[in-house]
Design a protein with these regions (language model features):
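Hydrophobic alpha-helical membrane segments
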Residues: 26-127
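Sec-dependent N-terminal signal peptides
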Residues: 13-22
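Bacterial N-terminal signal peptides that target proteins for export
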Residues: 3-14
């Protein structure tokens, strides 16, 4: 599979995850759903930037889990990692009820900081 087809496939998987997670958020407020969507979008950008790291040998990934996964399973580990991370984030947020907006806001802030940092050092999202 070519890199462009892989990215297209992973985008479709993320869109499906967004839709499924938002459908199952029956007891969630509009704010909760919006924060989850923002988190998913930021994680998608972070995933694409992380994939860009492995196309440029002058960069390196700071996350040891992703590095070990790529070393053992190849570049397809990156999207799998982010899909699992998003799923885990949804499962945790679903259990938090009153703390949900705080949790989702915190994870969004962390993801935004990573995306901004990656952008500043020159990583692209491959669009």
């Amino acid at each position: 599979m070519t890199p462009k087809k892989e990215v297209y496939l992973y985008r479709k998987i993320f869109i499906m995850l967004f839709c499924l997670s938002l459908i199952s958020c029956a007891g969630w407020t509009k704010t909760d759903k919006t924060l989850l969507t923002i988190n998913g979008a930021l994680m998608t950008v972070d995933m694409l930037q992380t994939m860009d790291i492995y196309r440029h040998p002058e960069y390196y990934e700071l996350n040891p889990v992703i590095n070990a996964g790529v070393k053992n399973f190849g570049n397809n580990f990156v999207p799998a990692y982010f899909v699992m991370s998003f799923g885990l984030q949804y499962l945790v947020a679903d259990q938090l009820d009153s703390w949900r907006p705080w949790f989702l806001s915190g994870t969004a802030a962390g993801s935004l900081a990573l995306v901004i940092h990656n952008n500043e050092i020159g990583l692209s999202v491959g669009f």
